[in-house]
């Protein structure tokens, strides 16, 4: 929902008609609706694909809103839609004050918006996901009428909230865990951490070089490299936990009983799956 600095629902509805894929009824010079030979209303398509929209007034906020449903955010992004509403609002003498997201959304939807606004600022996009999310939240004005808690709005974060993660530990706690008389976290997790740190350092170098004078012609290369490093960093962070999880599964599989042919078969299948 995109918020406008007006009480007028008609303005919000007019914007909705102009942007939604279904568009609005075509009219003649006298304002009469034009129909085809079968009597069906001829429509003028809206400016955005994969977009349904309506305008309304929210008494609670004392603001008009353009309420939007994006049916394919990968083909029509949140930021593209937000910017189009801003453009249409300016034509009508009003301005967008911010927006809100009702329900949940995929992580990629916010990350791609963060990258879009960083590119507009001519800044590097090879940054941690948390930074990209923060940029998206501020650029889309998601805190305009209520606090936007991305930990409660992003699907992937909600799915992983209940999982215990070594990668979320403080460094000192993680090191102490390694030193204990338990097999996990072990060498694989430490190696994954080393890989993550290496990727982070390489990303830092690429990002520092991006903004350095004299390297302007190579900016695209540095952005690409820093983004690749961020992907590798994220993969390595996942592997910190995956190595320990895999080890535990293998050990549990080897501990299964093997007193008869059926148990032996189940045990072998479990070992195969775990490895």
Language-model regions, residue ranges each:
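Disorder-to-helix initiation segments
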Residues: 167, 171, 179, 183-190, ...
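Short alpha-helical scaffolding segments that buttress acidic/His motifs in well-ordered protein cores
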Residues: 174-178, 243
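Conserved phosphate/anionic-ligand binding catalytic regions in large, soluble enzymes, centered on
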Residues: 1-2, 178-205
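A structural-propensity feature for long, helix-poor, extended segments
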Residues: 211-258
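Long, contiguous binding/interaction regions
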Residues: 1-169, 180, 258, 273
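Amphipathic alpha-helical interface segments
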Residues: 1, 243-275
């Amino acid at each position: 929902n995109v918020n406008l600095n007006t009480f007028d629902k008609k303005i919000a509805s007019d914007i909705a008609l102009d942007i939604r894929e279904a568009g609005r009824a075509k009219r003649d010079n006298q304002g009469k609706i034009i129909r085809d030979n079968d009597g069906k209303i001829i429509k003028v398509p809206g400016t955005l694909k994969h977009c349904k929209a309506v305008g309304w007034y929210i008494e609670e906020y004392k603001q008009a809103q353009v309420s939007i449903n994006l049916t394919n955010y990968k083909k029509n992004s949140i930021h593209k839609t937000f910017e189009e509403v801003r453009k249409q609002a300016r034509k009508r003498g009003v301005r967008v004050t911010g927006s809100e997201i009702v329900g949940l959304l995929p992580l990629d939807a916010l990350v791609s918006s963060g990258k879009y606004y960083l590119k507009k600022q001519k800044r590097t996009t090879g940054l941690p996901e948390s930074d990209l999310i923060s940029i998206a939240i501020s650029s889309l004005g998601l805190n305009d009428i209520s606090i936007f808690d991305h930990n409660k709005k992003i699907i992937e974060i909600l799915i992983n909230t209940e999982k215990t993660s070594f990668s979320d530990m403080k460094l000192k706690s993680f090191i102490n865990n390694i030193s204990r008389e338990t097999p996990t976290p072990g060498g694989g997790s430490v190696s994954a951490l080393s890989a993550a740190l290496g990727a982070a350092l390489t990303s830092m170098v690429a990002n520092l070089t991006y903004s350095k004078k004299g390297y302007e012609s190579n900016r695209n290369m540095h952005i690409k490299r820093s983004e690749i490093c961020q992907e590798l960093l994220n993969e390595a962070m996942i592997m910190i936990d995956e190595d320990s999880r895999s080890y535990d599964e293998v050990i549990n599989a080897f501990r299964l009983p093997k007193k008869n042919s059926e148990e032996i078969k189940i045990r072998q299948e479990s070992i195969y799956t775990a490895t």
